[in-house]
């Protein structure tokens, strides 16, 4: 695997000329059009734009989670400063190699906490599994770490939440469990795709404060996706504005 030079020593993610399209009934729709940007260690970058502007498709491309077909990455590179592989283009990695990066080096929090957790497993077991797989912890070590994470994300009565099924806790608590899961392996990059949209305003503010605190404490880079400039302004150092699949504006907050 050839070594790749990133544009800056602090750069941990470099997206270059990314083009993604969807093919449906023979018709091609371009969702991401020649997008390029860098993410630096520990910084918070907001990606803002209206629905359909390509924000989530860009995020899913970074995670290599787009289903093909109908999605197709036409061109571009996504370079990651990986703990395991060195500087690598994630689009060239096998599914097996990607499994060691997802959750471990790049983690993602999705918009809808109600559907992000598996309803048939207890909340604690869902976090615990990630620790056993990626951090090679014993069951006891993973449980203790999970309870510690639940405390860190300010879940009340961590032991009770650990043994609860997702339907037994509130939407805000579900999202805190998802944040604990995402942060469990101390990833270099956390992608949050509209993580507060499904929550009420008070819970939304608490989740934003929590994520900002975790980012600073863990020195994790945050990519925060939203259609709401007010929310982005709360957490981002820098903003990328997307429109019709392109980055049309970029600036500091």
Q: Residues of each region from the PLM?
A:
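Conserved ABC ATPase "signature" region
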Residues: 79, 141-160
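ABC ATPase "signature
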Residues: 250-251
């Amino acid at each position: 695997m050839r070594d790749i030079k990133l544009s800056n020593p602090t750069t941990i993610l470099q997206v270059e000329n990314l083009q993604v399209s969807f093919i449906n009934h023979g018709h091609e729709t371009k969702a991401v059009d020649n997008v390029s940007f860098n993410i630096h260690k520990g910084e918070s970058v907001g990606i803002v734009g209206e629905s359909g502007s390509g924000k989530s498709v860009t995020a899913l491309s970074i995670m290599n989670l787009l289903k093909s077909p109908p999605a197709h990455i036409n061109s571009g590179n996504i370079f990651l400063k990986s703990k395991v592989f060195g500087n690598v283009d994630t689009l060239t990695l096998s599914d097996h190699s990607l499994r060691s990066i997802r959750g471990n080096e790049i983690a993602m929090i999705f918009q809808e906490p109600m559907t992000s957790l598996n309803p048939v497993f207890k909340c604690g077991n869902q976090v615990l599994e990630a620790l056993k797989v990626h951090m090679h912890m014993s069951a006891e070590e993973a449980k203790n770490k999970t309870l510690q994470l639940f405390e860190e994300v300010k879940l009340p009565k961590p032991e009770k939440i650990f043994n609860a099924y997702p339907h037994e806790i509130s939407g805000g608590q579900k999202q805190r469990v998802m944040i604990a899961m995402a942060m469990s392996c101390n990833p270099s990059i956390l992608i949050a795709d509209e993580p507060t949209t499904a929550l009420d305003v008070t819970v939304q503010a608490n989740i934003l404060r929590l994520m900002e605190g975790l980012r600073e404490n863990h020195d994790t880079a945050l990519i925060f996706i939203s259609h709401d400039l007010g929310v982005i302004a709360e957490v981002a150092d820098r903003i990328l504005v997307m429109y019709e699949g392109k980055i049309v504006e970029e600036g500091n907050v």
